[in-house]
């Protein structure tokens, strides 16, 4: 599922997860067929696994213990 490419510049912490979450939302049936905004679809429960992974990645940036272990995600 990850769409990480080596030729892309590294945008920052959790950039790959953020990009994949946006792509997942834009390709979901909620946005394509129903015409809702990605924010509404995210609240309705689409792409939950990527949403959780992005949350954990952002949380690990602030967690001092996780700073030594490395960020979760890609």
UniProtKB/Swiss-Prot annotation:
A motif (Cx10C motif) lies at residues 30-41. Disulfide bonds join 30-57, 41-47. Pfam families: Pet191_N (PF10203). The keyword Cytoplasm does not apply. GO terms for cellular component: mitochondrial inner membrane; mitochondrion. GO terms for biological process: leukocyte differentiation; mitochondrial cytochrome c oxidase assembly; multicellular organism growth; spleen development; thymus development. A motif (Cx9C motif) lies at residues 47-57. The keyword Disulfide bond applies. Keywords: Disease variant, Disulfide bond, Phosphoprotein, Primary mitochondrial disease. The modification Phosphoserine is found at residue 37. It is linked to Mitochondrial complex IV deficiency, nuclear type 9: An autosomal recessive, infantile disorder with a fatal course in the first weeks of life, and characterized by hypertrophic cardiomyopathy and mitochondrial complex IV deficiency. Postmortem microscopic investigations show accumulation of lipid droplets in cardiomyocytes and mitochondrial proliferation. Involved in an early step of the mitochondrial complex IV assembly process. PANTHER family: CYTOCHROME C OXIDASE ASSEMBLY FACTOR 5 (PTHR28627:SF1). Belongs to the PET191 family. This is Cytochrome c oxidase assembly factor 5.
